[in-house]
């Protein structure tokens, strides 16, 4: 990916859109959560497709809260949740996508990733543990992996980045 196509999060506001009303959003969210529960039951019953939900965000951005709120009406038998933390020794002994592929959803299931395979680029790049060539190769591998899931397993891959300000992050981390 060329630098001209990069998105700079610092250029994207963390403020709610003008005219936004929290009460309206809560009411809409409640209806959508119920609808998601119905759709999840249909997905599970048909066994023809899978969904992989990827949640990324800084510490304190609300990934855990989003999982609890959004998937509240879903049946636990049709969901898996994987929180990707620092790779274990066993995971380090394999390619960087090994642990992610193990957590990919089977048909009929929704797999929720709290953090994901993107961490294996983001964190290592920030700390200077991998060079730009390795970054490029891993991005290509991730794209190929997601295409494989889509093509071979009829998996819908949905990615969310929960974007908060540094002030909000600090506030959330202090509350822990």
Which residue stretches match the model-derived regions?
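Glycine-rich phosphate-binding loop of ATP-dependent small-molecule kinases
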Residues: 1-176
């Amino acid at each position: 990916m060329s630098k001209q196509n990069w998105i700079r999060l610092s250029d994207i506001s963390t403020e709610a859109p003008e005219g936004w009303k929290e009460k309206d959003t809560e009411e809409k969210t409640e209806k959508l959560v119920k609808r998601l529960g119905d759709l999840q039951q249909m997905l599970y019953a048909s066994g023809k497709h899978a969904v992989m939900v990827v949640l990324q965000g800084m510490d304190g951005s609300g990934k855990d809260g989003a999982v609890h709120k959004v998937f509240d009406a879903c049946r636990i038998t049709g969901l898996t949740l994987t929180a990707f933390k620092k790779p274990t020794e066993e995971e380090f002994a394999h390619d960087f996508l090994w642990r992610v592929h193990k957590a990919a959803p089977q048909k009929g299931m929704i797999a929720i990733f709290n953090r994901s395979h993107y961490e294996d680029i983001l964190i290592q790049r920030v700390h200077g543990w991998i060079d730009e060539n390795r970054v490029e190769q891993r991005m290509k591998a991730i794209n190929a992996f997601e295409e494989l899931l889509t093509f071979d397993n009829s998996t819908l891959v949905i990615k969310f980045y929960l974007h908060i300000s540094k002030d909000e992050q600090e506030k959330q981390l202090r509350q822990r």
